[in-house]
C-alpha cells in the first residue's frame, strides 16, 4: 500500500480575470446612480472587494441619504452652490457623509440651524447626526424658544450665529 500524502496549499489561488473600472464608469454615466449589486453585475463579479478596488480608480461619491448605498461619478453629479445634488430622491454631497454634510452646513450658516430646518435643507432626518456631532464636540447647541439651535463649535463663530 502506498503511503498517504498530504499536500498543503501555501497561496490562495486567485482568478486571473482582469476587471476594468470602465465597466462601472459606463454604467454610472448611463444610469447616473447605482447600488452595489448593479456595480457588481456590470463588472461580472460577486466580490464587493473587487468593485471597491476599481471604484478607487474613479472619482466617485456615495449618497448621504439611503445609508450611503448609492454611488455616482463626480462627472455625473450636478452639484449646486451648497454642495448638494440629488437624483431620484437620492442625495449626494461634496462633504461626503451625512455627519460631514450636517457639520459643514451648520458651520457655514449665517445663523445656526434648528433640526427641522436642517431636515428640510438636507431632505433627510438629521436629529441623530446632530446629536452625535454635539457629543463629538464638532457642533454645539443652544436652547432658543424651547428648541435646540445647532451652531458651530468655535466660540467666536457660535456668537455670530446666535
Cite the ranges covered by each PLM segment:
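Charged low-complexity interaction tracts in eukaryotic proteins
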Residues: 56-97, 135-162
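Positively charged, polyanion-binding regions of nucleic-acid-associated proteins
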Residues: 16-32, 94-110
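Short amphipathic alpha-helical interaction segments
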Residues: 45-54, 122-135
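A structured, charge-rich N-terminal accessory region that forms the first stable segment of a protein
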Residues: 27-71
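Basic, low-complexity intrinsically disordered segments
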Residues: 66, 70-72, 76-78, 112, ...
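Short, Lys/Arg-enriched N-terminal segment that forms or immediately precedes the first helix
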Residues: 2-13, 79-89
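DNA-contacting interfaces and partner/effector-binding or oligomerization modules
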Residues: 7-20, 108, 136-138
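Short acidic, hydrophobic short linear motifs in intrinsically disordered regions
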Residues: 32-43, 109-121
